[in-house]
Amino acid sequence: MGPYCAPHPLSLLVQAAALAAALAEGTLPAFLPCELQPHGQVDCNWLFLKSVPHFSAGAPRANVTSLSLISNRIHHLHDSDFVHLSNLRVLNLKWNCPPAGLSPMHFPCRMTIEPNTFLAVPTLEELNLSYNGITTVPALPSSLVSLSLSHTSILVLGPTHFTGLHALRFLYMDGNCYYMNPCPRALEVAPGALLGLGNLTHLSLKYNNLTEVPRRLPPSLDTLLLSYNHIVTLAPEDLANLTALRVLDVGGNCRRCDHARNPCRECPKNFPKLHPDTFSHLSRLEGLVLKDSSLYKLEKDWFRGLGRLQVLDLSENFLYDYITKTTIFNDLTQLRRLNLSFNYHKKVSFAHLHLASSFGSLVSLEKLDMHGIFFRSLTNITLQSLTRLPKLQSLHLQLNFINQAQLSIFGAFPSLLFVDLSDNRISGAATPAAALGEVDSRVEVWRLPRGLAPGPLDAVSSKDFMPSCNLNFTLDLSRNNLVTIQQEMFTRLSRLQCLRLSHNSISQAVNGSQFVPLTSLRVLDLSHNKLDLYHGRSFTELPQLEALDLSYNSQPFSMQGVGHNLSFVAQLPSLRYLSLAHNGIHSRVSQKLSSASLRALDFSGNSLSQMWAEGDLYLCFFKGLRNLVQLDLSENHLHTLLPRHLDNLPKSLRQLRLRDNNLAFFNWSSLTVLPRLEALDLAGNQLKALSNGSLPPGIRLQKLDVSSNSIGFVIPGFFVRATRLIELNLSANALKTVDPSWFGSLAGTLKILDVSANPLHCACGAAFVDFLLERQEAVPGLSRRVTCGSPGQLQGRSIFTQDLRLCLDETLSLDCFGLSLLMVALGLAVPMLHHLCGWDLWYCFHLCLAHLPRRRRQRGEDTLLYDAVVVFDKVQSAVADWVYNELRVQLEERRGRRALRLCLEERDWLPGKTLFENLWASVYSSRKTMFVLDHTDRVSGLLRASFLLAQQRLLEDRKDVVVLVILRPAAYRSRYVRLRQRLCRQSVLLWPHQPSGQGSFWANLGIALTRDNRHFYNRNFCRGPTTAE
């Protein structure tokens, strides 16, 4: 955002009137500064608004059904803010005035909502007030269906807060009292406070420090979320009337802190306590969450009567031993999803894991999550009880430290679709010896770091090219310790269709024998390895292979003098997608790729520029891909792209990506050699202008992306002849304008014209504004992302905030001319007057300047009686004699009208007052406190008391009033004196031994007593005390 220049109020008035007139005519976007989206949604997010925008009467306000004001700075909501939106149904006000604990700078904020703010919107159905500093529930309309009051400061819910909300079905009040949003007490829900909400079905009260289940909840509830409170005891009466409950979440109330990723309170000993009949009356319950509850065992009575239970989350407990012998699953025949993740033993990794035989009773189970249990060997005994499950489709075993895995066991599962073994330590197939051993043998391991959990797979760089693994059977072995692949690993896995082996250390030369058992494999991911592609028959054992990812296998290609054979591509009859991205391929590879089936090739992140620099050796590298449709040549260090290079690309190409190269020139006429090309991506290059010719006629180009270049000029008619062009991206360039002549009649057919992030010149009457307004439906982010680059006052601001003062105005021009003429006249007159009567002006100036300090000093004399109080040791007769006969005479008698007023103890102190009263009055009635010292090694008595009062004055008034006069400079100086000499030298004066230096001493002493000490401080060390305003 550029610098802000505050406009004149009259200019703002004229600007507002002009904008209002334009809106009334329907020329500007209707909901400035917000953006209208489909289906009546108005987006006002992240605009730093301080009040709700009141849209113009010309805008179709009756069509607005959703208004989003997320992350603004609205602290006050008025009764009239939403009155004009007669059909508003959804209102989102998140993150406008967050509580102090949730604010990025921890500033306190309190949002004010007037009584009729929401009552004025009788159609409102969904209201989100989360992350705002509100302390009570505002008055709400009876039409409300969904209400979110999460992460606010509301700590009390009473029966009167929701009066009349008979249509309310969803209520969210999470995070009103927890470590990120601290509070003086837990959320208090009065008994029966929500009982009047007869249609409430979803209630969420997570993270509120609740210690018990709120009493007398509505019986209509089907979802109750109470996780991460402090409810450590559950009894039947807590959920007595909730017979319609379908989902219950009470996890995280008695936490397992060794696996917590945030502040955690240890679960008390012998807790939690769940009564055997706690859930027995919840006959409709389908989902139960008991995660992170410090459970060591499960009571069979807990699940009595839960015949409909389909989802059970038992993760992050201590059930590592219990799952090997439990019989609790015998009655859960309807269970579809079971989560047992992170039920590990502290600091222990088991050699084997044998699931209890009762798992075989889960005949409806579809998904089982067992990651983070920590066992080292996976054999047929481990999952034997699961092989009989007819519906099991997804099995998660990642992050278990498994180092030996018998993968063939998955062939016995009749319906298995996905097995996740990623993030383990598998180095090969389990041997018979590894399958034997003691069941309870264990190895100590260190505790997992907080928050460690399996993350998503790295996104493929060309995600549009490679298909996903949503197939019948997928096995994920990514992020393991595989170095070689043997066909024995995949015995009995002929049904496998997708195999992920990315992020291993596979460095062998694949020769066509590694994947022999996988006759049905269609997708193979070998990215992020070290594969040696030397054999011409690599992967030929996979006749149905359709997608092969060999990206990020750069190490073999970086080895000097080693050749690489890519001829295997021609021998894969079903291959359609191939990624060779980011391998640094530059030399000693097959001279030509051939395939009749390949449709998409990702060759980004290589060095095609070096390959094409070798004469004609690799000129036809891609020409043998006869049916190629998509080709990615991004990040190949291409500085030029000759017509012969394009001419030797497959003629079947429809999409060509050349992003992030170094192209400074592109021959647009050469696009005719690619007759079927529909999408061309040239983003992130170094194009300076679109001036060398124009897009040729007759091409099929529909999408052109030249964003993130440095284009500052486009010749007229450049896009005219590309009659099929419908999407054009010109964003993030150096364009000063958008000229309609670039497009001609094509402007009316463009569906997307992106010109955001260009430094547009917002001069008054700029033609591009009218053009963009005519095509505003096709311009994404017109109201917010299309901004000005000049003039400086408007830099970074929307093109619709144009300052009308920059328009040509005759009156303003005359005023500017007169002002400039006056400045020229002054520029001539001032030097002339200085030459003729400069001394007189100098004298008058300094006379006035001298008068001002005197006036200030006269005003100060009314409050300060003395210029300085003199403090010395009367016991030392020599010092007293010097003070009375030298110091007093010099400062009071010999300075004439500049004489100073000194306060001396024996002369000016009042009799009858105590010593301290006189001393305090003297110090606080004097401008300076002067200490006359014979030595500085140690002081006491009156000197010490006076020094402490001077320091007290420094703290109270922020004034340094200390002046030190040392009569014997050669004596030892204390550390304080030496430090003061370094910081404020002029306030420490030394009596000269030679009479010739006494005149200078008295002059410096007079300056030290009449000027403020803060002027004397050495600016290299400090600025000195500043006077409080």
UniProtKB/Swiss-Prot annotation:
Keywords: Cytoplasmic vesicle, Disulfide bond, Endoplasmic reticulum, Endosome, Glycoprotein, Immunity, Inflammatory response, Innate immunity, Leucine-rich repeat, Lipoprotein, Lysosome, Membrane, Palmitate, Receptor, Repeat, Signal, Transmembrane, Transmembrane helix
Principal localisation: endoplasmic reticulum
Superkingdom of origin: Eukaryota
Ranges per topology, Extracellular: 25-815
Residues that span the membrane, as ranges: 816-836
Membrane-side (Cytoplasmic) residue stretches: 837-1029
Residues reported in the UniProt entry to bind DNA: 46-50, 71-76, 94-108, 131, 178-180, 207, 261
Lipidation (S-palmitoyl cysteine): 257, 264
Residues in the signal sequence: 1-24
GO biological process, one term: positive regulation of interferon-beta production
Repeat (LRR) residue spans along the chain: 61-84, 86-109, 121-146, 149-165, 166-189, 197-220, 222-241, 242-267, 282-305, 307-331, 332-355, 362-385, 389-412, 414-439, 469-492, 494-517, 518-541, 543-570, 572-596, 598-620, 625-648, 650-673, 674-697, 699-721, 722-745, 747-770
Subcellular location: Endoplasmic reticulum membrane; Endosome; Lysosome; Cytoplasmic vesicle, Phagosome
A molecular-function term among this protein's GO annotations: pattern recognition receptor activity
Disulfide bonds: 34-44, 97-109, 177-183, 254-267, 257-264, 469-498, 762-788, 764-807
Gene3D superfamilies with a match to the protein in the record: Ribonuclease Inhibitor, Toll/interleukin-1 receptor homology (TIR) domain
UniProt keyword Signal, yes or no: yes
PANTHER family reported in the protein's UniProt record: TOLL-LIKE RECEPTOR 7-RELATED (PTHR47410), TOLL-LIKE RECEPTOR 9 (PTHR47410:SF3)
Membership in a protein family: Belongs to the Toll-like receptor family.
Protein's recorded name: Toll-like receptor 9
Organism whose genome encodes this protein: Bos taurus
Gene it is expressed from: TLR9
